[in-house]
A protein has these predicted regions:
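Beta-loop-alpha module in the N-terminal Rossmann-like domain of NAD(P)-dependent dehydrogenases
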Residues: 49-109
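Predominantly a Rossmann-like dinucleotide-binding segment in NAD(P)-dependent oxidoreductases
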Residues: 123-217, 340
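Contiguous beta-strand/loop segments that form the cofactor/metal-binding neighborhood of enzyme cores
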Residues: 189-270, 300-314
Length: 346
């Protein structure tokens, strides 16, 4: 049995972490902490456990084995490192942290304390993405030559706990990034996972097109971005993100391989389609991708993966020691946009 505490009680905790822990038979929820105590109390009332007065009280509770870190991006590293140093296993929300140095310090703290540190890169776990990875590794359709992927929705203000344009997601000191990292890390990590290689270079442009604070001033981070990337093995393609896709969420990935075109979540019935070089199509009906509209459903797989990795003391597909290499692309995107140039990734 894994005894867990949850730090930060916004929407991602309520709709995903707490809900999925609650439905895992190997978990006991010990309690919650949030700076707004009423949020913590509401989740304790719904899912069980108690409310902690401070984050230190929670991470120093000897009855807690592991924690979820679901605070604003700027506090991921500080909170995670405190928890690891207190002897807790940690599942941290994405993006991992706001600088490479923070990410490295998190990984180092996990190693020093011999604790598991996983990052919520849930797209690695969808049945379609996992099967796509398997197909690519078999070589049945050849290697990936190029790719296109996009992720867009109407913005975090409709999803966040405040339901307001005053959300921390729009503030640079709390979020550090905009759509490029909030959404882009999902796709930057996914493509790296599928291609099976590390990025070589990136050119990124990030803009504010539509989002405003309640007083009418533009938000402090991007609401749209476009990235052109190349892998060390030569694979080349684009990642685009948007918080201004109004109507329905859009997530589509296309991989152009030596022997066909692989389409992921492009068709409402078949989540994976490969149009082969002879024009015939292999179609696979696997799943429907989870969106922010799919609230309170125990289906992301992240919590189950975290719990089993800790209880079985095994490596995980979500280990921070690997995800940090995807974060290198995020930081290179920031540099590229700021310097208006292509950036080579070490």
């Amino acid at each position: 049995m894994l005894k867990v505490g949850l730090i930060g009680c916004g929407s991602i905790t309520k709709q995903r972490h707490a809900y999925e822990y609650f439905h895992n038979d190997n978990v006991e929820i010990k309690g919650f902490f949030d700076l707004r105590q009423e949020r913590a109390q509401a989740l304790a009332d719904e899912f069980g456990g108690k409310v902690y007065a401070t984050v230190e009280d929670l991470i120093n509770d000897p009855e807690i084995d592991a924690v979820s870190v679901c605070v604003a991006n700027a506090y991921h590293a500080e909170t995670t490192i405190k928890a690891l140093n207190a002897g807790k296993h940690v599942l941290c929300e994405k993006p991992m942290a706001t600088t490479y140095e923070e990410c490295k310090a998190m990984v180092d703290a996990a190693v020093k304390n011999n604790k598991h540190l996983l990052i919520d890169q849930n797209q690695r776990l969808t049945p379609t993405h996992k099967y796509a990875k398997e197909l690519i590794e078999t070589g049945k359709y050849g290697k990936v030559i190029s790719f296109q992927t996009t992720f867009g929705h109407g913005g975090p203000e409709s999803w966040s706990a405040d339901k307001s344009a005053n959300t921390w997601f729009f503030k640079k000191d709390k979020a550090a990034f905009g759509s490029m990292a909030d959404l882009g890390i999902h796709k930057l990590d996914l493509i790296r996972y599928l291609v099976g290689d590390d990025y070589k270079s990136v050119y990124s442009k990030q803009v504010v097109l539509d989002k405003k604070f309640p007083d009418g001033t533009p938000i402090e981070v991007d609401d749209n971005s476009a990235e052109v990337l190349q892998f060390k093995n030569g694979a080349f393609g684009t990642v685009t993100t948007s918080w201004t896709v109004y109507g329905e969420e859009v997530q589509v990935t296309t991989l152009f391989l030596e022997k066909g075109i692989m389409k992921l979540y492009a068709d409402p019935e078949y989540s994976l389609i490969v149009v082969k070089d002879n024009g015939e199509a292999d179609k696979y009906k696997l799943d429907v991708i989870q969106t922010n509209d799919d609230v309170q459903q125990a289906s992301s797989g992240v919590i189950d993966e975290f719990v089993s990795a800790v209880l079985e003391d095994r490596n995980s597909i979500l280990d921070a020691s690997d995800i940090i290499n995807s974060m290198k692309a995020v930081f290179a995107c920031v540099e590229s946009n700021n310097e208006k140039k292509e950036v080579v990734i070490d």
